[in-house]
Amino acid sequence: MKRVFIMLAIVLGSAGLLFAQKSNQKEVKQLQSFLQQKSAKGDANYIRLGITDIKNPAMWKGVVWSDGRAISIDWKDKELAGELDLNGFTALQKVDCSRNQLTEINVSNCTALNTLNVSRNKLSELNIDNCPALVKLDCYKNRLTDLSLSGLPGLKNLNCSNNLFVELNVNGAQQLQSLNVQGCHLESLSVDSCENLKNLYCGYNKLTSLNLFGTVSLSNLNIDDNEISNMLLSKLPSLTSLICSDNNMKTLGVLDCTSLADLVCSYNDLTSLNPDGTTNLYFVDCSYNDLSTLDLSNRTMLQRLICSNNQLNVLDVSFCPVSYTHLRA
């Protein structure tokens, strides 16, 4: 038995030696530097990760290596803290360091990186220059005040909600399909010519206007709880859902949005509502406004209508299949 243990130790030692000889020493040193930083609990980060030998990268929990290069790092929810420098990890494909207390992370020049999740940290800075393969970025619930997508030509999904942005510009992000910027401090949001953008969630901000020029693929739009008093939406043929409640909105124009099915514009100051060209409306909630007339006639797809707490004298739902069990007036 003793001989077996000795042989096993020799094998493991040899494997560790071979890995050390093969590994990228720059990457190892950068990770070692982070592992030795103080964690959120006051001890070292490597202790939080259950790493017993900081000099043996082959045994580091959460890190996957291939040909001596780090290709994946999964260190989520480990009470880690400090600054993580992954600059130049050109084989790295996936990083998940969410639910920690990191203050800075650098993934610039990670040219193979396709997925990055650094949400629920204390990040005030996120360096993501030259990450051409990045498709999905989650950085919500941090302390970011600025974010540039110029080095992310392939980005499709971005969730940067609950940060400290005052303005955000993603103009011309050709591949972007989903953008969530809810719960920030946005006063300005630019999404011009994002021709593949399908989902835009920008509620709970301080926007006074929103230009959707060129967003021809937009399907879901949520601008709840902003400060947009007047809004005109036109020629958005793919738009199926519009939520714009709690804006103190005085005018809302919806023209030629032929796919629109759900319209929620409650808790505003609307005195009229004429969603022209929206023959596919299925659900409308325009409650808590100042409407005196409402004409939704010939909406043959309409199933639910909530229009309570208005000043309605005339309500026209003729030639609509809406049942009175789904009508609140």
Predicted regions and their residues:
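N-terminal capping/linker segments that flank leucine-rich repeat
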Residues: 4-12, 16-94, 111, 174
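Leucine-rich repeat
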Residues: 89-91, 110-112, 131-133, 152-154, ...
